[in-house]
Each structure stands twice: as C-alpha cells, then as structure tokens.
Curated annotation (Swiss-Prot):
Zn(2+) 1 binds at residues 24, 26, 117, 120. This is Ubiquitin carboxyl-terminal hydrolase 16. The UBP-type zinc finger binds 3 zinc ions that form a pair of cross-braced ring fingers encapsulated within a third zinc finger in the primary structure. It recognizes the C-terminal tail of free ubiquitin. SMART domains: ZnF_UBP. Residues 411-420, 449-468 have a biased composition (Basic residues). Residues 1-27, 148-200, 411-510 are annotated as: Disordered. It is found in: Nucleus. It comes from Danio rerio (Zebrafish). Homotetramer. A zinc finger (UBP-type) spans 22-143. GO terms for cellular component: nucleus.
C-alpha cells in the first residue's frame, strides 16, 4: 500500500510539474507507455489508419477536398491510434469521442510535436525534463528513423510554415535549420485555432476562437463573420487611428455657410469593436475573449444580459445600430461645437433645425451605412389610372421568408381537426388543445421556464375553481362569455413574440401554458380521463355544493380573488417582458439612438414613370421551380409583385382628385386595386441575408429546418430595380461572393450557433471603394473555409459549408 501511494503521488507531481502554463490534469490517465512502444513498431506514420481503410473512391474525394495536401496526423498517447485532423472525416476526434472506460484525450501531432488535450480543449505545455517530454522524445526517434516518414515530415513541415502567421517558435528539432522561418502559434491543423493565413500576406485575417461568456454562442458567431468583413475592418481602423475632420459645404440654394467639423473620439461600442478586431488579427493566443465588446453591447441593449440564449440576427441589428447611433452622435456634437466656435448665437429650436440641415446637406455617411447600408424601392401602381408612386427605405439586412410546404400542410390539417373538435355549445375539446401544440419544439425547457409554466397552470386552475364556486350566482351563459374573453387569452392573442433562434424559450410560454395545465391535471387527477374532464366542465358550473353555505363560498371567493389579482399582476409583467422582446428597430430606449433612425417616415411620391417599366428589374428573372428552396427562390418571393385588393386596396390620390365634385369641396377618398413590388434600388457593399427560420403560426412558434441552398456567387441583378444606383450603365449583373455564414442547429428550446467563415486575401479595390472587382468576369475570392464553434476552429471543405443550415449569410460585392 505504501509503495502504491508513493507511486501515485510521484506520478501526480510529475504530471503537474511538466506543464509550463496552465496544468493539464489528464496527462497520467491519457498516456500509456507500454502500449505506445508496441504501436511504434508500425512504420506507416504519415497516414491516418482509418483513411487507409476507406474505399479508393472516398480517398480520391478526400484528396480533392483538401486540395491534394496530406492531412495532418494526430497520434493518441493512450493506444497509439493515428487519426487525421484536417480532412472532413476528422478521425482523431472521432476516436476520442468513442465511449471507453478511460479517456483517450491526449493526442500528439506527428508534424509539429505539440500535444493537445481534448478535455481541456487546449494545447498541453510541457517541459523538456518531464515524463511526457521523454515519451514524446522516444516517439520522435521512432518516427524520424523511418526514411519515408522523415522525408514526408520535412515536406509537410515546410508546407505548414508557409500557411501560418508569425507568432510562436515551433518545437521541431530542425528549427536551427529553419530558424529564419518563424511559425505562427500552432500548427494550422490544430484542433483549436487553425490559423488560416499566409505568412507573407499580412492582409489575410487570422481565424481565432472566441471564449463563450455564458450562452454567448449567438454573439460569437456574428463576431466571427464581422471579423472577416474586410471593408469594415479598414473603416474601423481609420476611425480609431486618424483624427477625423471634414468640411460641410451646403447646397447653393441653402443659406448656410460652409462649416469645418472636428469629430470627437469614437463611442465606447465602436472602440470595443475596433479593439477586438485588432486583437483577433495580432494576438498570439489561439482563443480571444470578447468580454469588453459584449459588455458594451449589454449596456446599449440590456436584454442580452443574464446569460440567456438569444437571437443572432437581433444581436447583429443592435450591434450595428448601436455603432451607427454613436457615429450620428459624433457628427451631431461636432456640428454643434463648430457652430459655437463660429460665434453665432441661435435659439435652441433654431440650432436643432440648423444641425439637421447640415447633416442632411453635407455630412458623410457613417461607416455602418457605407458597409452594410442599402436601399429598397417600393413601387405601387394604380390599376385604374396607371399612376406610379414610389417610396425608398433603407436597410442593413434583408429578412427573407423560408417556405415550408410540409409544415403548412400539417398546420392546415390540424386547423380542420380543430374546427371539428368544437362542440355545439361552444366548448372546445381539451384534446384539440394538446394537438394544437404538437408543432412546438421538443424539450422540457429550463427550470425557470418550467416554474413559470406551473404558475400559469395554477392560475388557470384557480380561475376555474372560482367560476365553479360562483356557479350558483352567475348563469352558465355569463360564465361562458367571461371565459371566452378571459384577459389571459386576450393577452395571448396580442403578444408580440420574439423569434429567438435558440433556447430562449420565452416566445413559447403562451403555448407551454396549455401543455403544463394538462400535465398538472394528469398528476393530480389520474383517475379522470381528459375527455371526461372536458365533457363535465359545463356540469360543474350548474350545481352549488349542498355542504357549503353562502358565507363560506363568499369567503373562499374573496381569498381566491386576492390570489388571482396577484397572479394577474405577474401575468401583466410577463406580457410586458414579451412585448419588449419584439424584433423592432432598436430605437426604443435600449440603444441610445440619436434623432435619426434607420426607418424614416414612409411617404409615397408620385413619379413620372412608364407603367410598363415600373416593375421591370435590372435583369430578367425566372420563376423558381416547384419545391425549390434556395436563396434565389426566397429573394424571388420577397420581390414578387403583389396584388392589392379588397381590404388592401390603395387610396389613389390621382383618382380622388379626378372624381366629380372634388373642386367643390368633396374630398371623399377613392380606393383602387393596385400592384406593388419591392426591389433593391441601392445594393450594399456587404449584403446580409436573414433566413426567417423561426415563424409564428397562431399560438405556436416553430423552426423551419428545411435546407436552403445558397450559392457561392450570388447575382442580385434580377432583384434590383431598373434604375439601380451604383451599377454602371449597360451592366446586367450585380455579383456577390459568400464569405460568412451563421448556422443555427437544434431546436427552438435547445440550439447552438456556429459560424463558417472564409479567410481570404484582401482586395485593394474593396478597401478603397467598397467593391472588389469591376468586370463581369468576377469570381469567388480564393481562400479557406473554417467552421468555428466558440473556441473550437476547424478547416472544412466547401461541400461541408454548402450542407450547413444557414441562418445568416454574408456576401461581399465583387462587381
């Protein structure tokens, strides 16, 4: 026993002392010397043993996906298994994930001799004298004595150096020979960082993992895509480094004098964003902590506090609108300071008006609008007089509907069943309530959600008991009418539900109420079937218990009323919270906007346009085939011509003026059938597409899991107006290249956000003008795709990217 204790103690000391950085506690259990000695007899070191067993066709596909480069091999320090890391198969991590009695968590890179722990999700730092170092030294001797492996290792090592950032010096014994070539932090195929950049090209943005600060995957996925938005990075860099000043020269018709503006320091949110972008590019660490930026976002929008799961698209809007508001405030303050310096004194109201005029006449566009800002033109034409009117709206992203035929048919079928389940006296069968909630996502929800659902169930049960006890005083019809207009039901009908894409299940609480009530009744009254409960509801209202006196009933009713008032107050608070979660433009107080908002007053202006050209796009468009679900089909549906009829008819100003008696004072409005279409009139530099996967149907909220196909090169011309700005005359293409994807996997209640980003060289034209190419031969920029899940980064082939369940798509303009 004594020897065993000494042995355990020495092993633990060795494992802890050999780590230079944060100690890994899995070294002793993750290594096995005796097994590795036998495994070292195998001479096939340069290949994955699982890939060797694949069929020749699969191996050829794998080679094509990795551009002919041999994938890095990782050796398990427990059993000697050799698995690939760079390929789509990822046999090394699959070997670790296989259930065993002891963890196989430590792997050794046979290219750069670094050790990785899958449990710690970090590289294991070890000294040159510890037990782990001795084990690795023995393995290296075995590997490098094989001539085929030695040559392959040198070749692979040179290739890896050419695709890394300069950061850390490697631990290869040949570093004296290659000392002039500094390696970036870790091997490109490291299970954690996968730095995707060319060493000689500083313009390529590194890909770093981001720490999860507590259910912040929705935030990390968006930041990863923004970090690869090159034009945004350049503008942020200019704002942070340069002292911004500009002059405003009003129009000739204006009475205002030219004004020289000095801008103050950027806002805290903008600076935090700039700081994070620089850290991702320059840090030597494989994982970056975006705490400062997330803190600033929470200050602008407190709804993101509390470690709840949120919606990525909503976060993106708050982030961009917050920086946009800070820039507007900078310009506003600069104009005010310039007016004060000019020595002219104005009254408060007059000063506001002058500032507005300066902002409207000559103030430059802020960097958010320069990158993401676009414009939509909504065209309406009266069918009677053919008058064409137009209104232009600004946008930062486009929310596209995702059609789900299977869900629609299923919902229609349930609606028919729901109508048949209503009884003659107006009472609804409780089984239909259960059926109506089948479309809700699966999962029990968090403890907080379950507790809230139980409170709602208790409230309904108390309401029902109260109605039963008052049955002797109130008629059945009165009770039925009261229940049909119950405040809880009416509030459920008017609540605005946020489409939080992940497990923030508050939108579904209105439906969870019915499910929880059924479960509550089953637990308490198992002996009574649901059908009997529904059938006996009316009978319970008609009789007054003979064992109770009127005074007893009145006393109980008063007690119940107090409890109900308290529950109603809680319910009103819940309704208030749900209403504040609606997806509105963040100008409600969460974001400190200036006077300007993204959505100005929509006022249609009559234009002199040929009715035949009113609804013509920049390029011809073809209707999508049946059952097609792609970005193009979603855009087609979004920009389709609408017929305004019946209750949606247009109040035509021209027809109203042409009616008899109009000049005599008769100004009765005339409504006509009309046509309406929305087209893009000013395509943005960076096009952000939001696929609306979270939809509300009646009382249920569902996620559309249908795969939406998206192209690497998107031609936006069929969805742009004929008089589109920013397009050269005669051009019939507006091309965009995909570089970022935010994916949502899982259900409404239990989901996770990840990102796919394309690390690519920057284009000079993109930095200068916001566009990357000026010819019709534009093609997708060359680069490498990476899948990022918080701190974990893996290179992936394009085929894996195309199969992702996209929620947000980021395209950059290339023509």
């Amino acid at each position: 026993m004594g020897k065993k204790k000494v042995k355990d103690r020495s092993a633990g000391t060795d494992s802890s002392s050999e780590t230079a950085g944060p100690s890994c506690t899995h070294i002793r259990k993750g290594t096995e010397n005796s097994v590795l000695k036998k495994a070292c007899l195998n001479e096939h070191w340069s290949s994955c043993q699982d890939c060797e067993q694949d069929k020749p066709e699969e191996k050829q596909i794998l080679e094509d996906q990795t551009d002919g480069e041999s994938p890095a091999v990782w050796m398990c320090l427990k059993c000697g298994h050799r698995g690939c890391g760079r390929s789509g198969n990822q046999h090394a991590i699959k070997h670790y994930e296989t259930p065993r009695s002891e963890p196989h968590c430590l792997v050794l890179s046979l290219d750069v001799w670094s050790v990785w722990c899958y449990i710690c999700d970090d590289e294991v730092q070890y000294s040159s004298t510890g037990q782990l170092a001795q084990l690795i030294t023995n393995i290296r001797k075995q590997v490098l004595t094989a001539p085929d492996k030695r040559n392959a290792s040198k070749k692979s090592w040179k290739e890896d150096i050419s695709v890394m950032n300069s950061a850390e010096q490697t631990q290869d014994e040949e570093k004296g020979k290659k000392g002039k070539q500094k390696s970036s932090s870790k091997q490109e195929d490291s299970p954690k960082s996968h730095q995707s950049a060319a060493a000689g090209s500083s313009a390529v943005v590194s890909v770093r993992g981001l720490s999860n600060l507590g259910n912040t995957c929705f935030f990390n996925a968006v930041v990863q895509s923004l970090s690869q938005t090159q034009y945004l990075r350049e503008l942020l860099k200019q704002i942070a480094e340069e002292k911004s000043s500009f002059s405003i020269t009003p129009a000739l018709s204006s009475e205002l004098d030219p004004l020289q503006i000095q801008l103050e320091r950027p806002g805290s949110l903008t600076l935090a964003m700039c700081q994070l972008m620089n850290e991702i590019q320059e840090t030597k660490k494989g994982v970056v902590t975006p705490k400062e930026l997330f803190t600033q976002v929470c200050k602008k929008a407190p709804r993101f506090k509390g470690f709840q799961q949120q919606d990525s698209q909503e976060l993106l809007r708050y982030l961009l609108d917050g920086m946009r508001a800070e820039e507007a405030k900078r310009v506003n303050s600069g104009i005010l300071e310039a007016l004060k310096s000019s020595g002219k004194n104005f009254e408060a109201e007059q000063t506001k008006k002058i500032v507005k005029e300066y902002e409207k006449d000559g103030a430059p566009k802020n960097f958010v609008d320069r990158v993401f800002g676009g414009a939509m033109s909504s065209t309406v034409m009266c069918k009677e007089c053919k008058t064409v009117s137009l209104v232009t709206e600004m946008f930062l992203d486009l929310s596209l509907p995702v059609a789900d035929e299977a869900y629609r048919k299923k919902n229609q079928k349930k609606a028919v069943q729901h109508r048949h389940s209503v009884s003659d006296d107006g009472d609804q069968d409780t089984s239909s309530l259960a059926n109506g909630n089948e479309d809700m996502p699966t999962g029990t929800g968090s403890k907080y959600q379950q507790k809230k659902a139980k409170k709602q169930a208790k409230k309904q049960a108390k309401n029902q008991r109260r109605q039963q006890k008052q049955g002797g005083k109130v008629t059945l019809d009165a009770i039925t009418n009261q229940s049909s207009t119950d405040p809880a039901d009416s509030s459920m009908q008017t609540q605005t539900v946020s489409v939080n894409g992940s497990a923030d299940a508050q939108p579904a609480d209105t439906n969870q109420e019915d499910l929880s009530l059924e479960k509550h009744n089953e637990d308490q009254d198992d002996e009574e079937p649901e059908q009997e409960q529904a059938a006996s509801v009316n009978n319970r209202f008609t009789a007054l218990s003979e064992d109770q006196t009127t005074e007893d009933i009145a006393e109980q009713v008063n007690e119940d009323e107090d409890e109900i008032e308290q529950n109603c107050a809680e319910e009103e608070e819940l309704v208030e919270e749900l209403n504040t979660m609606s997806l509105t433009t963040p100008s409600e107080g969460d974001v400190e906007n200036g006077e300007d908002t993204l959505e100005d007053v929509k006022e249609y202006t009559v234009v002199n346009r040929d009715p035949e050209l009113a609804f013509r796009a920049l390029a011809s468009r073809t209707a999508p085939v049946k059952q097609e679900c792609s970005v193009e089909s979603c855009l087609y549906q979004f920009t389709e011509v609408e017929h305004l009829t019946e209750n949606n008819r247009l109040m035509c100003v021209t027809c109203t003026k042409q009616q008899p008696g109009y000049k005599d004072g008769c100004k009765k409005a005339v409504y006509r059938d009309a046509l309406k279409q929305m087209l893009i009139s000013d395509p943005p530099v960076v096009l952000t597409l939001h696929l609306k996967r979270f939809q509300q149907v009646a009382y249920s909220v569902c996620k559309v899991n249908r795969h939406v196909q998206f192209p690497q090169i998107l031609d936006l011309a069929p969805f742009c107006s004929l008089n589109c700005t920013g397009v050269k005359e005669g051009e019939t293409q507006v091309l965009y290249s995909l570089y970022g994807i935010v994916e949502h996997s899982g259900t409404m209640r239990s989901g996770h956000y990840t990102a796919y980003v394309k690390s690519r060289p920057s284009t000079h034209n993109c930095v200068q003008n916001g566009t990357a190419a000026a010819s019709g031969d534009a093609e997708a920029s060359k680069g490498s795709w990476f899948h990022i899940s918080d701190s974990s980064v893996h290179p992936v082939p394009e085929a894996k990217v195309q199969s992702s369940q996209a929620y947000l798509l980021f395209y950059e303009k290339i023509s």
